[in-house]
Amino acid sequence: MKLGILNGLGGKNISIDINRIKAAESMGYDSVWTAEAYGSDAVTPAAWILAHTEKIKVGTAIMQMPGRSPACTASTAMTLNQLSNGRFIVGLGASGPQVVEGWHGVAYGRPMTRTKEYIEIMRKIFAREEPVEHQGFHYSMPYQGEDGTGLGKPLKSMLAADTSIKIYTAAITPRGLETSGEVADGVFPIWMPPEKGDVLIESIQTGLSKSGRSLVEYDVAPFVTVMIGDNLEHCRMPIKGNMALYIGGMGARNKNFYNDYAKALGYEDAAIKIQDLFLSGKKDEAMAAVPDELVDACHLVGPVERIKERLQVWKEASSSGKIGSMLIGAGQQEALELVAGEML
C-alpha cells in the first residue's frame, strides 16, 4: 500500500502547509495531491510543493480537462517532471456540466470521448515519435475547423521524450471507471469502502482488458479522511459536511454523479434525502442526513484503537489488489503518523 496526502482546495485565500508535507515526506508518504474547482488552480501549488520538497511525488487531483488543451497539459507535465527529476503525476477529470459550461465556457460534450482523446494526444506528445496529428470529436490537431486559417501544421514537443509520466483520472461511474482502466494508469474513485471494491473493480478490469493489462499494473487510489478523537460525532461532522456537498449539491438534480455513486454503494434512500435537503437550502439538515455508516465505511474516525482496527480492513483490500494507494486527508499530525505507522 502506498500512502499519499491531500492538499485540498484553497478557499478565498490559498495556503500550503509545507511543514506538514515535509513531515509526511519524512514518514515515507509517496505522494501529495493538489486540487482545483473554480478558484485556485491545481498546477501552481503542485509546482510550489515540488520546489520545496526532495523525494515525495506531487500530483493533481484533479486538473479539469475542459479548462486546458491536451497539449497545454502535456507541456505542463513534461516541464514539471523535468524540473523535479521525475516526481510529477498527472491527475485529470472531466468535471461536470455546471462547472465546464458555467466557468470554462465550453460545451460539456462527451466526457468519455474527451478523456480518451485527451490522454491519447498527451501520450503522443510524451512519446515524441512523430508530429502530433489527431482528428476527433473534441480535438483537432492541426485545427481543421471552418473558422481556422489553415496554416496549422503537425508539431513535436521541443522537450525530450518522457513516457514515464503517469496519468490518473477521476471516475466513479461504470463508464468512467472502464475508460480509466482502458487508457489511464490509475483512478481516484473519491471515497471507497474497502469492502465494496468490487463495485468499482469489475468496470476497471473491463477497461484494463481492452488495453491488455491487469490490475497489478494499475492504481486504485481513494480519498480517505482521518480524524482522531474520542467524540465520534464530532469527528464525523466535517466529513458529513463534505459528503453532503458532493452527494447533495455537486451537480444538478438529474445529473449528480456523486449522488448516483452513493446509491450504487447501497445508500439510495439517504442519497435522495441528502439531495432534496441540500437543494432546498437546508444544508445543515443535509449534513445530518449523511449516515454514520457511510462515513465510517469510507473514512477513519474516532479513537486511535478504533482507527487501527479499521485499518486492518484497508490492509486486506491492499493485499487482494483492490486498492493500491490511500490518499489521506488529515489536518492532525498525529493522524498522518498513525496511518504511516500502521500501513508502511
Language model region names:
Residues 1-344:
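Active-site-adjacent structural elements that line small-molecule/cofactor binding pockets in enzymes
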